[in-house]
């Protein structure tokens, strides 16, 4: 079973190492023979926690951050792929104080979807307004 790991790909996260972190995660997973699906999502706007790495678990996405390349091996040692405890563990992403108090409308999908994937956009009800308009 593949484990889904999210690492942001927007310019702010990339400028502080998100690409390097994503590559390190992929390399470490391969080294440990752990099958992962690495999704490059948009940032949730928590720049003080970037790169913010999220892991999809049965309870929801669990957040770790800010993650540096030097943290990746210890994240795997702590079983972060199933939400394991680690000094960078922040909890369920949706329960983080900064996000919990928000009702996002315009940016509702930011940090959740891959910003360049039409399949992801459609899966999260993208084009719903267009679909409704065309049916009338």
Segments (PLM) and residue ranges:
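Feature of Fe-S/electron-transfer and energy-metabolism proteins
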Residues: 1-136
């Amino acid at each position: 079973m593949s484990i889904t790991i999210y690492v942001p790909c927007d310019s702010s996260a990339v400028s502080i190492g998100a690409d390097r972190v994503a590559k390190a995660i992929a390399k470490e997973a391969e080294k440990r023979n752990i099958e992962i699906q690495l999704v490059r999502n948009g940032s949730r706007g928590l720049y003080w926690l970037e790169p913010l790495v999220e892991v999809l678990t049965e309870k929801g996405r669990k957040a770790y951050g800010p993650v540096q390349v030097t943290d990746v091996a210890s994240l795997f040692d702590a079983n972060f792929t199933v939400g394991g405890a680690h000094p960078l563990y922040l909890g369920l992403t949706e329960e983080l104080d900064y996000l919990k108090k928000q009702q996002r409308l315009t940016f509702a999908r930011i940090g959740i979807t891959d910003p360049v994937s039409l399949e992801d956009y459609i899966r999260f009800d993208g084009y719903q307004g267009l679909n409704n308009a065309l049916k009338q």
